[in-house]
UniProtKB/Swiss-Prot annotation:
Belongs to the universal ribosomal protein uL18 family. It comes from Caenorhabditis elegans. This is Large ribosomal subunit protein uL18. Residues 256-267 have a biased composition (Basic residues). GO terms for biological process: ribosomal large subunit assembly; translation. Keywords: Cytoplasm, Nucleus, Ribonucleoprotein, Ribosomal protein, RNA-binding, rRNA-binding. Pfam families: Ribosomal_L18_c, Ribosomal_L5e. Its main location: cytoplasm. One of its GO terms (molecular function) is 5S rRNA binding. InterPro entries: Rbsml_uL18_euk, Ribosomal_uL18_C_euk.
Length: 293
């Protein structure tokens, strides 16, 4: 079939239908969303849970949600800016922090639904691919990965979050082919390399290299790490302590009491207050008039 030229006449514009708003804005892939949210027709009132992962410039966002007609319902969430509670104050957007955020989300949600003791996940970090197996009367919590419009690049931080969730005890259907350490040519997976990546060994190695080559640049580039007491010798151990702290207590921090905001506009008076203000002004004017007389 040859190329058909689109004739933009009155009939074309009369029948033209715009795409959905979030598609026009380039925010939602509805082809993927339909397949991630629509449940099997033989399942009734059974939500299809999604593991939503978003990487921003300053944060790693991980959520568990399901869709309704009114909109998505978020049942659990974890953010990398929560990691300072567990001993990690800097480097909150790197690969190791992404894994820790996923682990935090999994342990937090399983605690909420009472499955944290049944499904403890992969407690010893080896880097090996781990899939949750059913134990006891209750099946493991299942969620499918939702990456939005991000690219599925091998070794991406998105898959670090997924690895953390899977190791935390949630069933996320996946394969090892997108993890760091998987060789596309030989089709082999290097679990040891992935483990080192999760524990930030690549950062520690670069810190050692940079300190030897250019100490001024080292102090400048890793100034926040050094201020937090982190160096190449204790970085890996710090991430291990963070994982242990998350498994010990993954509950969210208590919300601080909201402070009353400062008012920059005049408070609106009630009817009785306005009436009283008029009466006071009249009384003052009468008093001034009497004094003049």
């Amino acid at each position: 079939m040859g190329l058909v030229k689109v004739i933009k006449n009155k009939a074309y514009f009369k029948r033209y239908q715009v795409k959905l708003r979030r598609r026009r804005e380039g925010k939602t892939d509805y082809y993927a969303r339909k397949r991630l949210t629509v449940q099997d027709k033989n399942k009734y009132n059974t939500p299809k849970y999604r593991l939503i992962v978003r990487i921003t410039n300053k944060d790693v966002v991980a959520q568990l949600a399901y869709s309704k007609i009114e909109g998505d319902v978020v049942v659990a969430s974890a953010y990398s800016h929560e990691l300072p509670r567990y001993g990690l104050k800097v480097g909150l957007t790197n690969y190791a922090a992404a894994y820790a955020t996923g682990l935090l989300l999994a342990r937090r949600h399983l605690k909420t639904i009472g499955l944290d003791s049944t499904y403890k996940g992969h407690e010893e970090l080896t880097g090996e691919d781990y899939n949750v197996e059913e134990e006891g009367d209750r099946a493991p919590f299942k969620a499918v990965l939702d990456i939005g419009l991000a690219r599925t690049t091998t070794g991406s931080k998105i898959f670090a979050v997924m690895k953390g969730v899977a190791d935390g005890g949630i069933n996320v259907p996946h394969s090892e082919s997108r993890f760091f350490g998987f060789d596309q040519e030989s089709k082999e997976y290097n679990a040891e390399a992935h483990r080192d990546r999760i524990l930030g060994k690549h950062v520690a190695d670069y810190m050692t290299y940079l300190k030897e080559e250019d100490e001024d640049r080292y102090k400048r580039q890793f100034s926040k790490f050094l201020a937090a007491g982190l160096n190449a010798d204790n970085l890996v151990a710090t991430y291990q302590k963070v994982h242990s702290a998350i498994r010990a207590d993954a509950s969210p921090a208590a919300k601080k009491a909201a402070k009353p905001s400062k008012r920059h506009t005049a408070k609106r008076l009630t009817y009785d207050e306005r009436k009283q203000r008029v009466a006071d002004k009249k009384a003052l004017l009468l008093q001034l008039k009497e004094q003049q007389e």
